[in-house]
């Protein structure tokens, strides 16, 4: 089968993780869910086209795709990968501290296009006929931050109502030094999960190369041994901090041994000391947690190293952390929407415009508590300030087709002013039409049309038609136009604006329904 072409947002992410963050092709491939060959191919194409990173701001996704891929040529033949001398590998494994990981790294340094680690191990096991080896856990300074939630919860009592609510304990642990952070949140949902990460990064004062999480639902949409599907909002947060999410493999406890061990320590260190205390707010609980975490990090000595976690952090992790961005990450979520024929998308009962030529298109919407961004094919086509969920419309004038834009000149004040100029009955009619509609904006066009009837029928007849319309509750443009065309405005009419109810045998009284 032909190789599936990468999306341009994936291409940009590959370039960022490789050229900014400095991750290996293998880690980038796992992080983005693409083949390692695709990562290498993307970097080769970038070099071939003479492009530099960061890419120019003026280059769009469409132009980048044309530059990198252009017109497909002949498919290059696949070079046969060189196979190691397995007997030599077996001899080296008998030496102290030598693992398959070490030997594979030496092999891949000699042959960068050689087998990936998993395939390398598989071929060796096939040759030797032995069981899989366990990879030794070793964490370089500033390389990994492990995150998870503790299993046990802490009760928080509402002082006014007495209602008890459970708080969840988020834990983050540095890979090399075991410096620990904990925070109580109301849930393990994505917004709380993201905010806990923001707090953790502020606590550590820097960012690691990798972010290792358990396969919690708010982080990983679909757990997989080889290619987990990471939540897009979580990936966006990692991109903001110039790190990469690296989920632990399912049913592989050694992948998350550091954080699992620390969770146990935190549960014993924190929860045991908090068991007899009553907390009346999340802030009170987090203050108590912060005090105990400070004691754990700064006072308790790790016997095998003879140093505290804080001392190890200052020595191993801190010098290798990347700086924090200027602003913390603002949680954003993604949703697919279809643009309506009125060139608006609906999000939480509020409507946002896009350029009218994109009507009926399927788009992606990225939204925070403050902003709404709309994307089509990776390009942003509209951006708005987040509106309240009240069924209203947020419309940008340039998004409207030309025949709609002229209505933008008619503000509510101008509509009422023009109606008052024609006569008091028309002013009342305009107010009634606007009040009747669920959304006032829906009545503006009808009012503009009614006011425009002055040119055809004159001021006096339009004012008379407005009075008759009010008598018979005709509150729409077609009804007013019909009154004028049929000259009903010339007929004698009651001086009263309200008609007596019609009485006949087909009308049922209120008692009918009781």
UniProtKB/Swiss-Prot annotation:
Domain Integrase catalytic, which positions?
128-317
One GO term (biological process): DNA recombination
Keywords of the record: DNA recombination, DNA-binding, Plasmid, Transposable element, Transposition
Q: From the UniProt record, which GO molecular function terms apply?
A: DNA binding
Can you give the residue ranges of the HTH IS408-type domain?
A: 11-93
Q: Does the keyword DNA-binding apply?
A: yes
The record lists the membrane-crossing segments as none
What is the similarity comment for this entry? Belongs to the transposase IS21/IS408/IS1162 family.
Identification of the protein by name: Putative transposase y4uI
Taxonomic source organism: Sinorhizobium fredii (strain NBRC 101917 / NGR234)
């Amino acid at each position: 089968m032909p190789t599936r072409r990468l999306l341009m947002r994936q291409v940009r992410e590959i370039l960022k993780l490789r050229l900014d963050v400095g991750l290996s092709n293998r880690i980038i491939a796992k992080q983005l869910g693409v083949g390692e060959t695709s990562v290498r191919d993307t970097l080769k194409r970038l070099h071939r086209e003479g492009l530099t990173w960061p890419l120019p701001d003026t280059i769009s996704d469409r132009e980048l795709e044309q530059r990198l891929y252009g017109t497909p040529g002949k498919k290059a033949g696949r070079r046969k990968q060189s196979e190691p001398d397995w007997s030599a590998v077996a001899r080296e494994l008998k030496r102290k501290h030598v693992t398959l990981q070490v030997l594979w790294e030496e092999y891949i340094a000699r042959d960068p296009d050689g087998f990936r680690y998993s395939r390398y191990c598989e071929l060796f096991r096939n040759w030797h006929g032995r069981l899989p080896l366990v990879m030794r856990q070793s964490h370089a300074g500033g390389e990994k931050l492990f995150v998870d939630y503790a299993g046990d919860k802490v009760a928080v009592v509402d002082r006014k109502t007495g209602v008890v609510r459970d708080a969840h304990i988020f834990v983050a642990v540095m890979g090399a030094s075991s410096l620990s952070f904990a925070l109580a949140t109301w849930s393990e949902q994505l917004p709380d999960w993201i905010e806990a990460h923001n707090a953790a990064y502020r606590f550590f004062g820097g960012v690691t190369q990798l972010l290792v999480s358990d396969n919690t639902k708010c982080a990983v949409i679909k757990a997989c041994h080889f290619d987990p599907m990471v939540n897009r909002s979580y990936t966006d947060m990692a991109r903001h901090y110039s790190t990469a999410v690296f989920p632990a493999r399912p049913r592989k406890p050694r992948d998350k041994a550091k954080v699992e061990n620390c969770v146990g320590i935190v549960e014993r260190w924190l929860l045991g000391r908090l068991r007899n205390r009553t907390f009346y707010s999340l802030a009170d609980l987090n203050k108590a947690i912060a005090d105990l975490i400070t004691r754990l990090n700064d006072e308790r000595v790790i016997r095998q190293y003879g140093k505290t976690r804080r001392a190890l952090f200052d020595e191993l992790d801190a010098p290798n952390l990347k700086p924090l961005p200027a602003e913390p990450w603002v949680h954003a979520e993604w949703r697919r929407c279809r643009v309506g024929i009125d060139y608006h998308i609906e999000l939480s009962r509020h409507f946002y415009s896009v350029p009218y030529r994109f009507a009926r298109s399927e788009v992606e919407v990225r939204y925070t508590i403050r902003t709404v961004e709309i994307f089509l094919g990776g390009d942003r086509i509209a951006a708005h300030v987040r509106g309240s969920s009240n069924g209203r419309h947020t419309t940008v004038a340039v998004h409207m087709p030309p025949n709609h834009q002229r209505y933008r000149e008619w503000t509510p004040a101008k509509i009422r002013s023009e109606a008052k100029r024609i006569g008091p009955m028309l002013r009342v009619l305009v107010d009634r039409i606007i009040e009747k509609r669920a959304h006032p904006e829906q009545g503006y066009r009808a009012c503009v049309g009614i006011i425009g009837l002055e040119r055809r029928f004159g001021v006096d007849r339009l004012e008379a038609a407005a009075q008759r319309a009010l008598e018979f509750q005709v509150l729409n443009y077609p009804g007013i136009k019909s009154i004028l065309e049929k000259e009903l405005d010339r007929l004698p009419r009651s001086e009263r604006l309200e008609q007596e109810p019609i009485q006949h045998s087909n009308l049922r009284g209120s008692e009918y329904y009781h």
